[in-house]
Swiss-Prot record:
<feature type="region of interest" description="Disordered">
    <location>
        <begin position="904"/>
        <end position="982"/>
    </location>
</feature>
<feature type="region of interest" description="Disordered">
    <location>
        <begin position="205"/>
        <end position="240"/>
    </location>
</feature>
<feature type="compositionally biased region" description="Polar residues">
    <location>
        <begin position="919"/>
        <end position="947"/>
    </location>
</feature>
<feature type="compositionally biased region" description="Basic and acidic residues">
    <location>
        <begin position="572"/>
        <end position="587"/>
    </location>
</feature>
<feature type="region of interest" description="Disordered">
    <location>
        <begin position="1"/>
        <end position="85"/>
    </location>
</feature>
<dbReference type="InterPro" id="IPR001878">
    <property type="entry name" value="Znf_CCHC"/>
</dbReference>
<dbReference type="GO" id="GO:0005737">
    <property type="term" value="C:cytoplasm"/>
</dbReference>
<dbReference type="InterPro" id="IPR036875">
    <property type="entry name" value="Znf_CCHC_sf"/>
</dbReference>
<protein>
    <recommendedName>
        <fullName>Zinc finger CCHC domain-containing protein 2</fullName>
    </recommendedName>
</protein>
<dbReference type="Pfam" id="PF00098">
    <property type="entry name" value="zf-CCHC"/>
</dbReference>
<dbReference type="Pfam" id="PF25479">
    <property type="entry name" value="Vts1"/>
</dbReference>
<feature type="compositionally biased region" description="Low complexity">
    <location>
        <begin position="65"/>
        <end position="76"/>
    </location>
</feature>
<feature type="compositionally biased region" description="Low complexity">
    <location>
        <begin position="624"/>
        <end position="633"/>
    </location>
</feature>
<feature type="compositionally biased region" description="Pro residues">
    <location>
        <begin position="949"/>
        <end position="963"/>
    </location>
</feature>
<dbReference type="GO" id="GO:0035091">
    <property type="term" value="F:phosphatidylinositol binding"/>
</dbReference>
<feature type="compositionally biased region" description="Acidic residues">
    <location>
        <begin position="214"/>
        <end position="223"/>
    </location>
</feature>
<keyword id="KW-0479">Metal-binding</keyword>
Amino acid sequence: MLRMKLPPKSTHPSEPPPDAEEPEADARPGAKAPLRRRRDCRPPPPPTGLPRGPPPPPSPPRGLEPPVASGPTAGAGMPGGGGHAAALREQERVYEWFGLVLGSAQRLEFMCGLLDLCNPLELRFLGSCLEDLARKDYHYLRDSEAKANGLSDPGSLADFREPAVRSRLIVYLALLGSENREAAGRLHRLLPQVDAVLRSLRATRAEGSRGSVEDEPSGDGEQDAEKDGPGPEGSGCAKLGTGGGLGFRAQEELLLLFTMASLHPAFSFHQRVTLREHLERLRSALRVEPEDAEVEPSNFAGSRAQNDSACGDYIQSNETGLVEQAQIPPDGLTVAPHRAQREAVHIEKIMLKGVQRKRADKYWEYTFKVNWSDLSVTTVTKTHQELQEFLLKLPKEFSSESFDKTILKALNQGSLRREERRHPDLEPILRQLFSTSPQAFLQSHKVRSFFRSISSESQHNFNNLQSSLKTSKILEHLKEDSSEASSQEEDVLQHTIIHKKHAGKSPALNVATSCSPLDGLTMQYAEQNGIVDWRNQGCAAIQHSEHCVSSADQHSAEKRSLSSGNKKKGKPQVEKEKVKKTEDRLNSRINGIRLSAPQHVHGSTVKDMNLDIGSGHDTCGETSSESYSSPSSPRHDGRESLESEEEKDRDSDSNSEDSVNPSSARFSGYGSVAQTIAVKPPAETVSLGTEDGNLLEAALTSHKYPHIPFMPTLHCVTHNGAQKSQVVIPSPKSADGKTLGMLVPNAVAISAVMESSNSAPVGILGPAASGESEKHLELLASPLPLPSTFLPHSSAPALQLTLQSLKLQPPQGSSDSCPVSIPPQPTGSLSIGSPNTAFIPVHNPGSFPGSPVATTDPITKSAPQVVGLNQMVPQIEGNTGTVPQPSNVKVVLPAAGLSAAQPPASFPFPGSPQAASALPTQNSSALNAATSAQPASTGISPSQSTVPPAVPTHTPGPAPSPSPALTHSTAQSDSTSYISAVGNTNANGTIVPPQQMGPCGSCGRRCSCGTNGNLQLNSYYYPNPMPGPMYRLPSFFTLPSICNGSYLNQAHQSNGNQLPFFLPQTPYANGLVHDPVMGSQASYGMQQMAGFGRLYPVYPAPNVVANTSGSGPKKNGNVSCYNCGVSGHYAQDCKQSSMEANQQGTYRLRYAPPLPPSNDTLDSAD
């Protein structure tokens, strides 16, 4: 079985013995040919009689016999004569090295390393062999094993200088069970402190009393069962005695003690890691100095190097191992460690790939391509300071004087500016110097370690600890054939760090990354950089699989648009230079992902315009600290950052020059997610976003129309209570002059799909303007509701309502173009369609009986136009007519519970809970809200009002509070999906105060127990009265009335106004209704407040039945206990014992040694 794991060497690469043979073979003359023959050999079965000194060493080779028993065929079939005999000699030398040279600690560590290389079947077989071998000594070690695994205190074992204490600790560790954590913890506390050991070594070394402890008698005879004879150990680690005050045996016992403890499975992982660190400190303290190596006799040089490698851990990187191996004479039993084989790989060639300036400072970064002797190629990036310090500290024997002077002069030139340098090109000089570097420089250990290590600057910059050293194995015969491909891969693997500056006036380079099929070399780092989530979000918005545009095209377009903006706005030349510097860093990569630009949006009749999407949360290459540094502040894209702060803060209304410039469209919302949208309108280009917040804009004559404000998309880590900003939507216009209508955001993810074949597919709510007038734009809700965590919530909703302004220009057509498509509705009734659907048509004022009343909005002075809701708006008392539905647009707003098929291009619509928050028209239509009505509940009646808009259209900052006439004190202050502020008009067009449609004073809902008995609406949502990490879940069934005794002795309110009720934030992220904490108190029922309807379903818990008798909640029979299965109670109230405590797993796989045989007849019978 081991044959399948064997590499081209004689045994496994992790085994030190064969690897150590190679340096010795290289040192001997004429050993190259046997080395080649050993590459393909397989170890034959061990010889019957091997010359071993002490009796215990044969047991480990016997354990190794079964795996290597099938090797003769491989050994016999080796190329060259004498292959089988050479393999036998190799194996015999391995046995001699293991039994005679290694000490106990080194043998145990070596055997554990071999066991890690075995497969499970081999381990089972070796376990059987070990059981058989250990059974013979079981009756001798039985008492000690009981003491080691028992609960009794082993006694005082604190003084590690006593040989009896060390011997007893070694025996206890050897006999400790692998699952006895309690005894392992006790032994861990009894282990000597490594600091005390090191202090003792220093003290005895200072006194000069060496070998004082060596001749002390062993306190326990059982020590010999765990250790070999003192002769091999003393001779094997003779070097340790030269460096410390403890004797040979004491040093070996301490090493054995810490080695066994660091490898024992009974200790926890943390304990083993700590013990491994202590072992390394002890080994470094006991290791011999280089000057002592020259004084030692030459016949001990081989064993000294072997013990140095064996005492050193395989993970450790010993710098002196290679130097010691070079001094080994050919006559010693030299076996190199595995570490020496790794260090034997040297550098063959160093090429300077490129020099780039780091940020705007004066230092540079150097990217090197390093070819190693094992045919691997690495790309290393070093800073100017690191390279200069490395060359200054380089020993003189590894480099020539002319080389140092020339390269240091070039590096000193690199710290200067380009105009101050003597040599104009630094890169060719350094490239020539490194390519012609001497062999002594390339093969030195410090050069290898420098080009293997990770740059400290890279460790500082990348939070994911991604190494700037990436190795790609390239076969030698593929180097010449695929030189171009390999150079491209190396370019891909280069690191260039783009540092983003989050200051307001500083230029930034925030490049949005469009999803593209990346190659395997780049996608292996995707999970560490958060690109997986970005791909899932970005690729969901792509309707057609098209190739991504390069980032150079995007920024060249940005430069052209910026240059035109500079001509118009008179920007200084410094801003243009900043743009050029931005362009120089386009083809760079961040953390292994190449930056590319989003899609272009091509129009069929107008010029092409770039769809520039600003960087959002998942900008490629961002680290987690950058993403969460300022979550509630809007991101600035590259172009906005180049503008001055005064230009960004100015008030941009519909008459501003930005509305006239459709080619400078940019989607720079409130931390919006960078997505790529493929938009192909048939007749007119839809450009997405401008600098001042215009999101949707018709490309032909969009500047003639005012805008509809709506809530932009928020960053997904927006703090609770963050203020809402405004981004404006212009009302698009069809080819024949008819206004398409308004786009009303809902609280769910809204996707824009095409209703008819002539309509254009829109990626982000882009209305396609076609040549026909009978077109509908249908907005369906995605079945996935948008969590309320991603939406802004005001800290005091009753006082900080945001009233949006709706500015619509009347269409140029007559009122005949809007035929009445819906019959008039009777008073208090509901119209056609689902009760979850609201149609918001846009139509001409000629369809309304009421005459317009002038308002105070000074922006536009055109004819009035009304946006009304004729669905879900009960017309109450004296409404003379209903609002007709026009034929040119239909906006469907289903609630979150409406299941709609998700179109291929879905976009989480940036909406707050205000579904129809764009309320008053710009000139004559306003919110007909009485003092007790809900202004943000978004009701628009066919009549007119003189209430001005409370918020200006293009306020750049947070919206102020509305007028006092529009505030109210109910819990439904933030209601979004349904309309309750409906006014009535008489024939003269004056306002009649509407009947109160507020909630029931007892239950907070519109039920028959309050004053509004004629309105029975069972399936609707409540507002969100508070900020918090709540998730909105759809309501799956209607809400029963819970007015009887549901509140804490709350009196009935006849006026319909309910007291404001604010609950603390729920600690449950899933938003499920949990069992109330106060459920055991009297007169307490599940409180159903109106504000929680948007957070989670507000039906009462099935186990809580409200009553008026004051006896508390009652459990009904619908509840069952999962512990005992009986209905009527929960598992926490169950009287039966927990089933988890009774059902214990009976499957245990362990190695339990059998009882000691009464006599020796069993062995003979077997």
